């Protein structure tokens, strides 16, 4: 194998400032049945982000919802010009339910930007994004960045059903070739996905692949990456306490140089080399 | 002039606020100037490399958390090569926390970590003693005495003994540590606890059980800090559930000469810096000239005589 | 048909929900029909009249409370004359909690309270043993064994031993109680804690220290209940911080055959009745036929072997 | 001494139902700088009260205020016809601060009515009320009851200053002879109060005296009661956990038959015989 591993190995501590600021909520609205979009009025200082980075949110406490730890959330959009920070989230438990109660004008304290984001190396012209469900949140700013850098983008968006597919128009506006796949139409299976990607490779070629979350997709891309010698990156999740590297609770195992090593998702990640990642 | 300093044996700290081991690292320097702190305390290290416990390593309980991080460690050499030099740039003294599974290993690590740049050694004797029945050294006066005696011979640096709440013999253990030569007590480490996910019916921690820390733990650790301050003459450093400047004040009143902040930093990463300001404001508005005047000022009257050593809940 | 019953030795309870000693009394009958409960548990009594501890006897801590009520008691005779007859009107079995300062007094009170109307005796061995060094009987296996042995000889009624969290030897104490003849364990009493008013600088409790109960205490007591259920064959009754039906389920999954509800009743006086309904709903919707199927169903895999007896926080 | 002690000794458990109900807030407004009036929309069931009784309030929890135990609060007014329950309270700590955040339409859970209220025996024609500060809250419904029963009422209302004197008009409407005393005007001292009461005794006579709270006033009335052989009652406070008699945290000491006995304020009280009470 001669895939160049990306520099996801522990870097010396980078002393980029991290901010903990209270932001006013501009909007917090349902996007479809399961997802909500949270738009914050954010100071310029925290909007110097890299796609793939995240913030650690201090969810509000109420009589019925009392989350204690912060909750990590990928940056869905950062817009220094408008002074906006966007999150796209799924209501799953106490923390995200508490987030969902926020109304316009209330404030939310966010810590960030945190972690290591995606790389788009200079010679990567044809980029492939494969996202499922809320994974779009993580990949959306990457698409914007690719667009700004004038790269060609193919976005395979997978979901349970048509109406769970979000942001297709957004990706199209960015000039991406969008390929929607759904469980309902039976198009989202791994076999079909492989066929589509291999066709793309044969057609224009793919210089780098990006994904997040799903185990099935990880395995597929690892296999394609090995076969066709294409590098890639994946954004991973793990439960977090501190979010900045102090507590070591967020580790996951990675293959590296024949060994299994633990890395902190909040610090060495959340973006890791595709081939080093281990599914769960 | 307000005097925020506090004395821990031969060490003078510029203020009584410092982090708790395992809840602090170099990365916090991205948030504020770490030199505002009274001291820096590192995550416990072991001599050899260790990977720590299985995930999930933390979970939330009502208003607090459990952790079973264990002691992942890059080992002594990496620590000396990378961590000690990092903290050299600061004036605040560096306290290194160490652990081992036997008294001999403990002592040899203690000796090898007694190097320039290290101001004091915190010994995490709340870890299991693998030579005995797996109970932590600090659960019993006898094992505490044995390990501290050896450690005392191994270093000239100040030795801080970090106690465990998983014992019915807090004051006896405190006295054993003092007698064996500890220079200060850190009171305390986390309390063994558990949570189960009722949907999956699996323990919420990969390690089955873990240590409770955060606000829920405060009244317990405060009680221990008070008991220790009343029963030994060496300084007591309070630790457990401290989340606000009021909590800091409560521990100082109870008799702690300094405090360590753990879990609160996860929720509010600037909290230690804010507590220093808050303490200053409190002392000024209350007319105190120094932290010293506040320490141990609890108005416990006669009650203290009979009650200090009570270790059964009433 | 859903089977809510649970078996505690020779006693069958119609459901696993009962009050904790000291947080229940006849007055609660003004709120709901007490016969919905699995059992009735009285406040600990002593033979002689006692007035209890100085006030303030309770204080609030973040999301929980401390108490130092002590054991005010109208004495054995008043109890037999007034309290036992009151509970006679109910089908639910009456569990009487007793305490004394020495094994002999304990045993003689146990004998004298073994009268018709009493279904079982809960022995509050978390109280100080005045013959030893004032540590509670239940802090050590030896004193636990000694007192339970005597009590076992003093009565034919089922004996429930109520343990204390103020020990580093939970499983050893549990085994000692089993070996000495206890029919069940109640796990557990409150955990020694403290709070200081930073304005007056006085302890918030008249008694200086008191016992932590309520939600903050849950992960600790749950851990103990789990450890006990794994280490003894007699039934374990879980107690500590149970405030919602989810908490009840968590304890049952951990291995408790029944639970006691304490502090939660102060906040929501109907909570026990609601928990019974909630448990029924849960079992039905999850497809369980009985409470028994839920008890001890924790998915702890291999983890349990190595870890159950771990009593040091990691 | 031949004052007939009132039957405040422990009565056998009375099995009057106690309710725990959620009530909508009708109003919650400042009365003056220190006090607030809370008006609840209450079901008829909980409005069968006796003056002097109290409710145990489950204060709301928010991000910044997290009271855990309930808070006891005297009934300031109960109006079965309007379906209203009134509390007059002083914001002192976490619980009452949380109460103060309640807005119209929100709900509050209240447990009650609780405890033993005041007695107005058939042959008590001339009643004296002595209240200071928030003590008025407790004595107000007693004044209304006395009015309904056609008794003569003298109300001595003491406070720090003129503007802290509340409800004087309310007492006057009930036909009471209202005597306001303030620290500011130097009229509230014990000596002056004694002179006023003794004048009243000499003039129309007093059959019973009622008060609450203040130690100074307790001592004064005890002394007057003994001298002039006038019975009386006092409403007392103590910290409470359960509020209904289970936990025994709310005890206070009383003199009875030459002995000191502990009674539960929530159960045997909060109203006790004046002579048996011990100040603190
Ligand atoms: C780097 C990163 C980026 C993420 N970005 C997004 C995003 O853009 N949109 C989105 O909807 N979700 C995202 N997640 C997942 C999100 O953090 C969890 O859904 C959220 O923490 C759940 O909290 P809860 O209280 O609602 O759920 P609960 O299940 O009640 O949470 C209980 C605990 O588990 C943790 N937890 C639960 N699920 C996850 C998870 N998947 N990852 C990490 N911790 C978890 C919680 O933080 C909390 O500590 C991200 C996670 C990580 C690590
Ligand atoms: C029977 C009874 C009737 C009362 N009626 C009124 C009333 O009508 N209006 C009014 O303003 N206040 C009344 N009080 C006092 C009121 O209960 C307290 O002011 C209130 O509990 C303070 O709570 P906090 O959280 O705001 O204060 P904090 O001081 O923060 O309270 C801390 C703890 O102390 C308790 N506590 C503090 N002060 C008192 C007190 N005086 N009595 C009992 N417990 C206290 C609280 O309940 C809480 O548990 C009454 C008290 C009792 C016992
Ligand atoms: C995530 C985490 C990791 C910890 N690691 C260590 C450790 O390595 N060594 C140690 O002595 N204590 C460790 N502790 C315990 C803390 O230092 C502290 O004693 C405890 O958390 C109580 O303080 P707190 O309530 O302020 O967090 C750890 C605590 C947490 C929450
Ligand atoms: C006010 C109060 C009084 C108590 N009195 C007793 C008692 O007399 N005997 C006893 O064995 N336990 C007593 N307990 C302990 C409880 O029975 C129970 O073990 C403990 O409160 C933990 O349960 P919880 O968290 O559900 O309250 C008391 C607890 C409280 C809060
Ligand atoms: S969350 Fe603390 S190290 Fe990653
Ligand atoms: S408050 Fe519980 S007995 Fe009075």
Where are the regions a protein language model picked out?
Chain A
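Local cysteine-cluster metal-coordination motifs and their immediate loop/turn environment
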Residues: 238-270
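Anionic-ligand-binding alpha/beta catalytic cores of soluble enzymes and soluble regulatory domains
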Residues: 2
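Short, basic/aromatic-enriched C-terminal tail that caps enzymatic domains
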Residues: 19, 262-280
């Amino acid at each position: 194998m001669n895939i160049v591993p990306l520099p996801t190995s522990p870097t010396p501590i980078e002393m980029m400032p991290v901010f903990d600021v209270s932001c006013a909520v501009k909007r917090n609205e349902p996007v479809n049945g399961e997802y909500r979009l949270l738009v914050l009025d954010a100071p310029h200082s925290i909007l110097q982000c890299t796609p793939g980075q995240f913030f650690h949110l201090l969810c509000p406490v109420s009589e019925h919802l009392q989350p204690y730890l912060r909750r990590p959330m990928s940056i869905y959009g950062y817009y220094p010009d408008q002074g906006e920070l966007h999150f796209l989230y799924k209501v799953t438990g106490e923390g995200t339910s508490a987030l969902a109660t926020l109304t316009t004008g209330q404030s939310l304290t966010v810590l960030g930007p945190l972690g290591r984001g995606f790389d788009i190396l200079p010679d990567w012209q044809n980029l492939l994004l494969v996202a499922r469900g809320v994974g779009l949140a993580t990949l959306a700013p990457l698409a914007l960045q690719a667009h700004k850098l004038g790269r060609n983008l193919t976005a395979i968006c997978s979901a349970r059903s048509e109406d769970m597919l979000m942001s297709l128009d957004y990706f199209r506006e960015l000039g991406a070739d969008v390929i929607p796949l759904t469980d309902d139409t039976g198009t989202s299976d791994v076999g079909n996905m492989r066929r589509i990607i291999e066709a793309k490779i044969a057609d224009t070629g793919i210089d780098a692949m990006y994904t997040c979350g799903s185990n099935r997709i990880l395995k597929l891309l690892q296999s394609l990456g090995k076969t066709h010698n294409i590098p890639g990156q994946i954004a991973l999740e793990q439960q977090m306490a501190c979010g900045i590297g102090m507590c070591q609770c967020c580790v996951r195992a990675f293959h590296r140089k024949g060994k299994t090593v633990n890395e902190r998702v909040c610090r060495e990640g959340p973006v890791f080399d595709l081939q080093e990642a281990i599914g769960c | 002039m307000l005097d925020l300093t506090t004395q821990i044996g031969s060490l003078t700290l510029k203020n009584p606020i410092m982090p708790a081991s395992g809840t602090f690292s170099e990365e916090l320097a991205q948030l504020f100037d770490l030199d505002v702190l009274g001291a820096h305390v590192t995550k416990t290290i072991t001599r050899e490399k260790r990977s720590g416990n299985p995930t999930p390593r933390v979970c939330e309980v009502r208003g607090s958390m459990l952790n079973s991080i264990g002691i992942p460690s890059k080992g002594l050499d990496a620590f000396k090569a990378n961590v000690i030099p990092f903290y050299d740039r600061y004036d605040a003294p560096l306290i290194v926390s160490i652990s081992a599974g036997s008294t001999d290993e403990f002592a040899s690590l203690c000796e090898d970590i007694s190097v320039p740049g290290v101001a004091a050694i915190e010994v995490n004797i709340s870890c299991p003693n693998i030579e005995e029945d797996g109970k932590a050294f600090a659960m019993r006066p006898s094992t505490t005495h044995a390990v501290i005696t050896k450690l005392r011979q191994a270093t000239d640096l100040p030795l801080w003994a970090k106690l465990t709440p998983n014992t019915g013999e807090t004051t006896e253990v405190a006295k054993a540590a003092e007698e064996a030569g500890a220079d200060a007590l850190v009171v305390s480490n986390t309390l063994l606890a558990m949570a189960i996910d009722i949907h999956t019916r699996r323990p919420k921690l990969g390690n089955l059980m873990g240590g409770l820390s955060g606000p829920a733990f405060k009244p317990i650790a405060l009680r221990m800090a008070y008991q220790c301050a009343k029963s030994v003459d060496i300084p007591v450093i309070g630790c457990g559930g401290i989340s606000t400047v009021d909590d800091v004040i409560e521990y100082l009143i109870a008799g702690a000469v300094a405090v360590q902040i753990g879990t609160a930093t996860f929720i509010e990463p600037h909290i230690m810096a804010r507590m220093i300001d808050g303490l200053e404001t409190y002392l000024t508005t209350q007319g105190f000239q120094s932290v010293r005047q506040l320490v141990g000022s609890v108005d416990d009257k006669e009650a203290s005589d009979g009650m200090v050593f009570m270790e059964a809940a009433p």
